[in-house]
Amino acid sequence: MPRVASASVVYLRAEIPSSHASAPILGEERMGAGVAVSGEHVLTAHYIVLGAARVEVVGIDGRTREVERTALDHESGLALVTLRSGDLEPARLEPEPELRPGDPVFLLTCTGEKERRGASGHVTFVGPFEAFWEYMLDRAIMTTMVNPGLAGGPLFDARARVKGVVSLGLAAVGRFSLAIPVSMFLERRERLEQGELPSPAERRAWLGFYPQASEDGIAVSGVVPGGPAEAAGLQRGDLVVSLDGQSVQGLRQLYNVIWERGPGEMIGMQVLRGEAIQVVQVLAGDRYEFFK
């Protein structure tokens, strides 16, 4: 394990108020890993610090650093934590050359404040990924590795260059660790370092529901409490037939149609409920405002 690589990995602890919208789903205390991308900036998976009132960053030396702010990007699933002072040892971020199936990789993570663990393997897939929480990537990295610790740590190539952030363990569905390409962070780096949100024109419509692709179509497996879909009356078990009359097949097409709209726009969802088609008018929300 290269020393610089292991020294760049930090432990994160986040405290979330019980009143925050993410608390019932993700919990009020979360732990994760992150990677230093500069002396004072730590990159991690965004759900670890989503809604956090307090975040602690602990380096490999066991010392806790004070956090100035966190900046989230819902589209990529990444977050940048900014420290009050910078003494971390950053890792090398190099998106090029891009990883390909078969390339050797390794990940580093934490199991506690001082404990670091790693795993090595190979890339199995680089390509589109869709998830049921209104999240989609055009390019995700799948590997053969099972994450031996907490989410949010870095994925390295054989030359110890950061290529991604390990977000999820997907062993239950036949895939192993999923990583978000570091290029997605570099595209947003300046904004995240400034703690800025995307402009209103850049924000996507958000409905607050959990669609699942099935043999029968796109089924609603649940709704976010207090979210736009719940307010509109969308129900678990509904089958999505179309959006404003446009037929949708699969999560990718569904999300692309939704994301053509912005927050505040009305979207008519035609759903099959029981044996009848119903139209549910959903006033699209702003994920940044809902989860602020």
Label every PLM stretch briefly:
Residues E193-L197, A201, A219, E230-Q235, ...:
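PDZ-domain C-terminal substructure recognizer with occasional recognition of PDZ-binding tails
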Residues V4-I25, L107:
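A short, Trp-centered hydrophobic/proline-enriched beta-strand micro-motif
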Residues E94-E98, P154, R159, G222, ...:
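A short glycine-leucine-enriched loop at secondary-structure breakpoints
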Residues V10-L12, G34, E40, T44, ...:
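Terminal peptide-recognition signature
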Residues S8, H20, R84-P90, R117-R175, ...:
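Active-site region of chymotrypsin-like
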Residues G27, A91-M136, A171-S177, R189-E202:
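Flexible, gly/ser-rich surface segments that form the specificity/activation loops bordering the active-site cleft
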Residues P17-S19, M31, A36-R117, R139-A140, ...:
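Conserved active-site neighborhood of the chymotrypsin/trypsin-like protease fold
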Residues M1-P2, A158, V162-E215, N256, ...:
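C-terminal cap/linker of serine protease catalytic domains
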